[in-house]
Amino acid sequence: MAADDRHGQPMVLSRSGETMAEPLPLCHLNGKLLPLREARISPLDRSFLFGDGVYEVIAVHGGYAPQLAANIARLARSLGELKIRNPYQAGQWAELIRELAAANGGGDLYVYLQVSRGSEYGRNHAPLPDVEPTVFGFCAPLPPTPPELYEQGLSCITALDTRWARCDIKSVALLANVLLRQQAIDAGAAEAILLRDGWLTDASASAVHVVIGGEIRTPPRSHQLLPGTTRLLVEELAAAHGIPWSSAAVSEAALRGADEIWLSASTRGVVPVTRLDGQPVGDGRPGPVWKRMRALVEASWVPGG
C-alpha cells in the first residue's frame, strides 16, 4: 500500500501500476447524503441484473469542476438514448455534484455518478413503464500521476475493439472494456488502443489522439466511440491556440506511423504513449505537441485558466 493522499485516504497500486485511492466517506443515494458504508441498493436493481444504466465521472480540481457542463450534457444524452427518465435538471445535477464534493472535503477529487433505470420486483427484459431511476454517487481523490509517466510515457498494445455497437452511450455495461484492459495488463502494458475494421476507435478507458506532421487527429464522432469530455477540451484548446487539429479517420497504418500518440481521460488529462506493441512511437519520447497541450489542459483546471 502506498502513502496516504491529501485527503488521508490509503492509496493502493492497481495491476496496471496506477495509484487508486479508496472512496471518500460520504455518498449520494436517491436524494440523500449518507455514509458510503451504509448505502444499500436493491439486488433487483436493473443495473445489477442487466447493466441497465449509465454513469459519469466528473474531475474536480481544487473544488472546481472545469468540464461540469459537458459532463452533465453527456449524462443527459446517455439517459435519453436509453430512454431512462432523467430525474434532475442540469442545475440540479450541478448542485448535487458540488454538494457531494464539498461534503467530502473538496480539493482534488472525482465524482462518480451512476443512474440506473431502477428496481423492479422481478426480472423483466422489457422494463415496466413506472420504474423509478436509482441515483448513486461517490467521491474519491484524483489519483496522482507519477512524474515518470510524463517523462517516459506509457506502453500500450493494440487490440480488436470488441465493445458493443453504441459506444457513444456511457453505459455501465463495461465487460468488454474490463477484458481489454486486462489484456493490456497481461501483456505488460498500461492500456489497449482499439482497432475496428482496421481503423482507430478508442482505448479501453480513454480517448486516443495522434499527431502526424504537427497536426492533432482524433477519430470523428460516431456510435463507435465515446464523446470524451477531455477530448472535447483538446479540440477547443487546439482551435483557441492555433494548433492544427482535425476530426479524421485514423487507419492502423497511420496510427503505427504517428509522430505522437496520446490518451485523454477526465481523471488524468492528457498522457503520452511512447511505445505501441513494443515499438517506439516517433522518437520514443513524449512529443512537443503533447507537451504544449498538457500545459493548456492543466491550465484549464484553474478558474479563468
Please describe what each predicted stretch is.
Residues G106-V115:
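Ordered, amphipathic secondary-structure segments that act as subunit-interaction surfaces
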Residues I97-G107:
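Signature of the catalytic double-stranded beta-helix
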Residues A2-E99, Y121, H125-G305:
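Helix-start/capping segments and mature chain N-termini
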